[in-house]
Amino acid sequence: MKFIINNNILIKNLQKISRLLVKNTSLPILDNVLINIKNGMLSLTGTNLEIELVAMIQLSTEHISGTATISGRKLLDICRNSLNSSNIEMQLNNNKMHIISGNSRYILTTLPYDSFPVHHDFHHISEFFIPSDILKKMIEKIQFSMAKQDVRYYLNGILLEKTDRSLYAVATDGYRLGISKFFLKENIIPFSIVIPRKGVIELYRLLNIPKQPIKVLVGKNNIRVHIEDLIFTTQLIEGQYPDYKSVLLENKNNFITLNSKLLKQSLLRAAILSHEKFCGVEIHIRNGQFKVLSDNQEEEIAEDRFNINYTGNTVKISINVYYIIEILNSITSENIFLFLNNANNSIQIEAENDASILYVVMLLKR
């Protein structure tokens, strides 16, 4: 193996791949990057077993095909300490990687490439194209609703499913629920998968690119996304995701229109003295007035109110204040619709000018 590559190009791709590298005493090869040259294409692969990322780079200079694995962190450090515009020359000799950068020389140890774990056996059951900005938005609007280290492991991620002609992304921790959807023009094979939390976070980072169509391949145990010159693959979570549609309101006649900014400001004021553990506030809606009350373990009290256009029945509910604030942070419309549940166990929130997202938040027992 032998090739020459511009340091700018190499470091740009190594920075993305290095996020996956882990120091594992029982499996040291996970700290390595798999380097492969075939048919004039250089591929760099990093994995943490759950997620795999492959960077594809077209070589424009003379090269010799081959495969090797070397420490990703050490290679990245070499690149970072080299001139940005310089060329990096790499050559494999007697299972040692010889690297030349300007006036510097390095010799790195390699590990057997055939023990590097890769997703060679990926087979997809469904595929589609989606604009990168749309998929990024779908994740962005609901990812805060994902569970963190929940024993119900299927909640520690996002449900991605295709039903009818729409693609749905769903996240819930059992106390709140976020749903975003996108209409697919093409008719694709239906699927329902759960992407793990770490995979969701990494995919969201990779989608920070100019708007362009990206290809998504859905497998039985993995999902693969082609993003520019990157191939992202992550394992899926097994298990039956809860029936999220059962908590959605069928009757939407009982709702209140609220100014997003006024509501957020009021909640932030009340949150100052909310209970540190439960973060609960009481909301009273009556006679055209929206009132928020909070207290804490030190018997301190906060109250804030603002006027609204509402003449219906008196409403009294208790709710986690930060759940609502996080929702308001993700909504860009001037107003929101707050739908009341007749069973008085949850509320549903929708943006005034964006029908593609909605949220459900469970109420606290008073």
Swiss-Prot record:
Keyword Transmembrane annotated: no
Gene Ontology MF terms: 3'-5' exonuclease activity; DNA binding; DNA-directed DNA polymerase activity
Q: Which domain of life is it from?
A: Bacteria
Question: Can you say where in the cell this protein is located?
Answer: Cytoplasm
GO terms classed as biological process: DNA strand elongation involved in DNA replication
Which of UniProt's keywords are assigned here?
Cytoplasm, DNA replication, DNA-binding, DNA-directed DNA polymerase, Nucleotidyltransferase, Transferase
UniProt xrefs under CDD domains: beta_clamp
Keyword match Mitochondrion: no
A GO cellular-component term linked to this record: cytoplasm
PANTHER family documented for this protein: BETA SLIDING CLAMP, DNA POLYMERASE III SUBUNIT BETA
- What is the stated purpose of this protein? Confers DNA tethering and processivity to DNA polymerases and other proteins. Acts as a clamp, forming a ring around DNA (a reaction catalyzed by the clamp-loading complex) which diffuses in an ATP-independent manner freely and bidirectionally along dsDNA. Initially characterized for its ability to contact the catalytic subunit of DNA polymerase III (Pol III), a complex, multichain enzyme responsible for most of the replicative synthesis in bacteria; Pol III exhibits 3'-5' exonuclease proofreading activity.
Subunit structure of this entry?
Forms a ring-shaped head-to-tail homodimer around DNA which binds and tethers DNA polymerases and other proteins to the DNA. The DNA replisome complex has a single clamp-loading complex (3 tau and 1 each of delta, delta', psi and chi subunits) which binds 3 Pol III cores (1 core on the leading strand and 2 on the lagging strand) each with a beta sliding clamp dimer. Additional proteins in the replisome are other copies of gamma, psi and chi, Ssb, DNA helicase and RNA primase.
Q: Which family does it belong to?
A: Belongs to the beta sliding clamp family.
Protein name stated in the entry = Beta sliding clamp
Q: Which organism is it from?
A: Buchnera aphidicola subsp. Acyrthosiphon pisum (strain APS)
- Name the gene that codes for it: dnaN
